[in-house]
Amino acid sequence: MTKERFKELMQPIADGLFGKQKPYHMQQGTPPVVRPVGMIVEDLCAISDDEWAKYAFSREPLNGKFTEEQRVELTRKAMACGREYAERVVKEHGVRDPEKLAEKLGMKVDYPRMPQSTDRVLFAEFREPNKIHIYMDGVDKGEVLFAEPGVRHALTAQLDIKKLLLGHELFHWVEEKYRKEIWTRTYRLRLWEVGPVHNDSTVMVLGEIAAMAFTQALNNLHYSPYVMDAYLVYGYSPEAASALYEEMMTFAGRTPRLPEEPEPAE
């Protein structure tokens, strides 16, 4: 595969991932080694919460303002925030299932095939005040991959892609409702200060990290939903998914595996 063809494949995926990431290989224009999807999810499901911090912050506009220790600390706090609010809404409404919870919260959820604008891949989105779209093209492609070797074992039968996406988007509604008190909105980073004058900013990625923890708690998953960044993209481009896999593993301080060499012919 040429660099030009790889860039062409990657372009519509760049801004449409679950975590809205752009893989390093896209920036470099170098095609990755394509891995089996079962290998990808097996390795990514083993990454710990702290190890996801560097990947999560990698596209945060203010990323350079933080040390590695601060990224880990903020990731822990954002995840704790997401889990706290998951348990809060479950206790308040008496249901954990994301579809039933969405109904209790008065959300209008629909399941169109694809977004109206088809220039990029998009899996789900929240639109104020109370609309959530789950795009079934990506969901269906992900469900087809369940049949691939190792996928169901890694992701477990507990995974329902629609509910995972829905839970993630529900957090954005929760975050908006509690915007005056929720930690992901009240945390501020001081950008500069001159005497009594200063400029503070929210940190966008904290809401995404919390949303991942929120839907993880609702769906009772043992692995981070960030795994879906690579998994759902695989249905569109194994090359793009493999690029994300390499980047995720590297950011986590782990060595990306290569596909096994084929057995010699008899």
Task: Please name every model-derived segment.
Residues 163-181:
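Active-site recognition of the HExxH zinc-binding catalytic motif
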Residues 94-95, 167, 208:
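A structural signal for well-ordered alpha-helical scaffolds and beta->alpha junctions
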Residues 146-155, 189-197:
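A solvent-exposed, charged loop/short amphipathic helix patch at secondary-structure junctions
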